[in-house]
Amino acid sequence: MILSDRDLKYYLEKSWIKIQPLREDTIRENGVDLRVGNEIARFKKTDKIFDPDNPDPSFFQTEKGEEFIIQPYEHVLLTTEEYIELNNDVMAFVNLRSTFARLGLFIPPTIVDAGFKGQVTIEVVGSSFPVKLKRSTRFIHLIFARTLTPVEYPYQGKYQGQKGVTLPKFNSQISSFYYQHQSI
């Protein structure tokens, strides 16, 4: 079941969904808008090979600021201003607000799992021309859905509790939680 604005207000009142800071214009008809945070990570152009078994953070350049220029076809990681917490029976689909999609910006399909807590880090792919993003601009839209029952294993993954832009985490950094709960 997709949550409407009324449902969202009720879930927020009951603390089944938490969003900090929560502004008046955040809650929309069938979802919540989240804002551009104060940090991005740019993917560096290189011929060097990235090895997931031996991750090297030098492939990224992290920046803090009040505004960011996304260059043509550039890939960046962006964080939201808001910190969210989802109950064990609530998940969210992340979409780019249509105004930015109409500029040619793109984000891949992304899900926020039931039980997640943290700021959302999202990949953004640039348009065919530079686009300026300012901190606190409503940028992504979360559509919340309630699961029929609470999930058996709420999200406890490697990005739980993340604050700021979070670079990818691989094998040696992955919690064994997921593997402990797989059927054989």
From Swiss-Prot:
Catalytic activity, as annotated: dCTP + H2O + H(+) = dUTP + NH4(+)
The keyword 4Fe-4S is annotated on this UniProt entry: no
Binding-site residues, dCTP: 97-102, 113, 155, 162
Assigned EC number: 3.5.4.13
Domain of life: Archaea
Catalytic residues (UniProt): 123 (proton donor/acceptor)
A GO biological-process term: dUTP biosynthetic process
Membrane-spanning ranges: none
Keyword annotations: Hydrolase, Nucleotide metabolism, Nucleotide-binding
Enzyme class: hydrolase
Pathway in which the depicted protein is active: Pyrimidine metabolism; dUMP biosynthesis; dUMP from dCTP (dUTP route): step 1/2
Tagged with keyword Oxidoreductase: no
HAMAP family for the chain: dCTP_deaminase
Family recorded in the similarity comment: Belongs to the dCTP deaminase family.
Quaternary organization: Homotrimer.
Function noted in UniProt: Catalyzes the deamination of dCTP to dUTP.
Protein known as: dCTP deaminase
Source organism of the structure: Saccharolobus solfataricus (strain ATCC 35092 / DSM 1617 / JCM 11322 / P2) (Sulfolobus solfataricus)
Lineage: Archaea, Thermoproteota, Thermoprotei, Sulfolobales, Sulfolobaceae
Originating gene: dcd
